[in-house]
Amino acid sequence: YTLMALTTAATVPVSQMLLRGYVISEISPVEAGWWEGMNRISHMYLMVITSSFSVYYLPRLSELKDSVEIKREIVKAYKVIVPMLLVAFTLVYLLRTVMIRILFTPEFLPMENLFFWQLAGDFFKICSWLLSFLLVAKSMTKAFVSTEVLFSLNFVILGFLFMRMNGVVGINQAYLVNYVVYLICMVFIFRRILYVK
C-alpha cells in the first residue's frame, strides 16, 4: 500500500509540473493560471469522491473474495455513481461562470472554456477508479505502479501534442483521452471478473 501511495504522490505532481512549465514557456503564464484554477476546482470535488470511496467502497472490495460478488459490488457502484456524476457535473458546467466569479477574479473567466473537457475527463477518471480501486483492494502492486507510471507519462505526451494544436485547452483534452484509455485498460485487466456469469 505504501509503494502504491508513493507512486501516485510522485507521478501526479511531476506530470502536472511538466505540463504547467510547458504552458508558461510556450503559451503564457496567464493561461497556465487558468489551467491551475481549473485543476483546483476539480481537486475539490475529487477529494470528496475519493474520501467516500475509501470509507466504504475500498474496504468492501477488500473483504470480497468471490468474483461474482466482486462484479455485483462494482455494478452496484456504477449504478449509483454514474447518474450522480452526470447530474452533478451538468450542474457544475451550467454554473461554471458563477463559480469562477465567486472563486476567482474576472481575469479567470476565459477558464470556462476548459470546463467541458475537464468534467468529461473527471467523469471517465472516476469511472475508471471504480475498477482501479480493485488493484489496491487486492494488493496488485505491480499492475498499479505500472499503470500509474504509464498513464502519467501518456498524459504528459498527449498534453504536449494537444497543446501544440489547440493551446492550453489541449491539456484538458489530453486528460479526457488519457482517462478514456485508462478505463479501457482497467476493463481489460479485470475482464475475467467483469464478464463472469
Regions found by a protein language model. Name each.
Residues 1-5, 22-43, 109-112, 168-173:
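Interfacial/gating helices of multi-pass transporter permease domains
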Residues 13, 40, 122, 148-153, ...:
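Residue-level recognition of pore/gate-forming positions within transmembrane alpha-helices
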Residues 29, 75, 94-123, 169:
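Interfacial segments at transmembrane-helix termini and the short loops linking adjacent helices
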Residues 38, 42-66, 134-137:
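Helix-loop junctions and terminal segments of transmembrane helices
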Residues 49, 53-57, 126, 130-134, ...:
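C-terminal transmembrane helix end/exit motif
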Residues 67-91:
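Membrane-water interface segments that mark the loop-to-transmembrane alpha-helix transition
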Residues 98-101, 142, 152-184:
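Membrane-interface helix-loop junctions in multi-pass transport and translocation proteins
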Residues 120-150:
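Membrane-interface junctions at transmembrane-helix termini in multi-pass inner-membrane proteins
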